[in-house]
Amino acid sequence: MAGGIIQLVAYGIQDLYLTGDPQITFFKVVYRRHTNFSVESIIQNFTSVPDFGSTVSCTLSKSGDMINKIYVYIELPSVNVFYDESGNLDKFKKFAWVRNIGYALIKDVSIEIGGKLIDKQYGEWMYIWSQVTNKSDEGLDKMIGNIPLLYDFSNGKPKYSLYVPLEFWFCRNSGLSLPLVALSSSEVKITISFRSAEECYRIGPTHSIEIMEDIVPFEFGDYIEQKIGQKTIHGLYMGYDYMTKKLYYIKIHSPTAIKKSFESQQLRNSTSQRENYRIYNSLTGSYCTPKPDHSEMSEPTELSQKLHFINAYLYVDYVYLDNDERMMLIKNPQEYLIEQIQYNQEINVKNSNVKQKLTLNHPCKAHYWVVQSDSLVGPGTINDVFNFTTSHIRNHDGRTIGENPVTKSKLMLNSRERFKQRDGKYFNIVQPYQHHYRGPDTGINMYSVSINSQCHQPSSTINMSRIDDISMEMQLKNVNPNNTHKIRSYTTSYNILRVCFNIGGLAFESMD
């Protein structure tokens, strides 16, 4: 008797719960017929010229019956190569776009129906969402420009085309596609605010200092630091000119830091020791020594060109329906359960114990937040836009080595604990593991009351409209008046979009 037959006849009363009165078979495919439809991606242009630092709008044409996915297409310009004063290629000056440039470019993006704001999202939020939901990093990285060709330093850059997927409720679920055919009396408008060019790239070196040694034990891209007493300053090594003995670097420091520059020994100060001024490799401990009585020098970081988008527009997926389904949408009022993003304005923090007051409404399913050092983003920094850790250092594979700035946290509702205080790993690792498809990078924190935070089907919420006082209490690491940070938070919530009489609007406004 074949082994498979033995398994088949070994049938007992317990099997009734598994195979008694069977309802499906695994050996005959069952499918369901669907309504007749087609999808076409159509370019939609902005009403004004899109560019770095601009805010532009696009009123979507009524080219189809419904709208599903939307992509922002941006063609980045090429960046000219740098030349030195002799007309030769500059050996030290380099340019790089920031990581995840597609998301970094978008400050915020909103959708209005009939002149009323329905949802507003942010480039940072789209990055956070991709960190917990995206299953295919390689494809998305190419779409948003998160590739070495763009974020590695080089002398000049080629042009590059970005396709940034928007994450509105109708973009993520075909069953929630926006019914344009039932909104004939309402305009649907997408508005995007782009960040300035200076917020989206890195250029170096920013400074230089003369060194005593003929050779320095650093490689391009090494992180360096100088610590004098209790004061420390950091930098990113860009190169060394053995002819002039100049060490070139990008200076990294917080705007509120006490130590503002790399220093050298002042010979008139007989109490200082030359060894105290060594510049060290932050990871290996190798060092070089600044030449006494020489100060840090600023290096020019201006571009020889003004950066502009080559082109930018929207790719909108229009859905075309068969007559019966189209008429059903037109004649019958529709209600859609949609998701919105509630953003709490960033707060500045300069001490380790923080209470962030949250202004929230409606049934909320999950809360996400990041804490970022001011030394990482902005003028005079490394401009590492999506680094939410305690360190500016990245390994050669691009991964950050820092820790989550959030050491402990708890959510307070009307002065009562929603849960007992828990450590940062719970919010950065455990919660995403429980409620999402993947774990995010270090420093992205979340807390979900829903079973499946990325599923449209509700699975528990908190009605924040019925809570008077909402706050997140946190203990932070390495935060002080000399190393200030910012906190930004995003909350996903439900609302109802009603479509009837050719117009659309929300059932519950923010103050309900």
Swiss-Prot record:
<dbReference type="Pfam" id="PF16903">
    <property type="entry name" value="Capsid_N"/>
</dbReference>
<dbReference type="GO" id="GO:0019028">
    <property type="term" value="C:viral capsid"/>
</dbReference>
<dbReference type="InterPro" id="IPR016112">
    <property type="entry name" value="VP_dsDNA_II"/>
</dbReference>
<dbReference type="InterPro" id="IPR031654">
    <property type="entry name" value="Capsid_N"/>
</dbReference>
<protein>
    <recommendedName>
        <fullName>Probable capsid protein 4</fullName>
    </recommendedName>
</protein>
<dbReference type="InterPro" id="IPR007542">
    <property type="entry name" value="MCP_C"/>
</dbReference>
<keyword id="KW-0946">Virion</keyword>
<keyword id="KW-0167">Capsid protein</keyword>
<dbReference type="Pfam" id="PF04451">
    <property type="entry name" value="Capsid_NCLDV"/>
</dbReference>
<dbReference type="GO" id="GO:0005198">
    <property type="term" value="F:structural molecule activity"/>
</dbReference>
<dbReference type="InterPro" id="IPR038519">
    <property type="entry name" value="MCP_C_sf"/>
</dbReference>
<comment type="similarity">
    <text>Belongs to the NCLDV major capsid protein family.</text>
</comment>
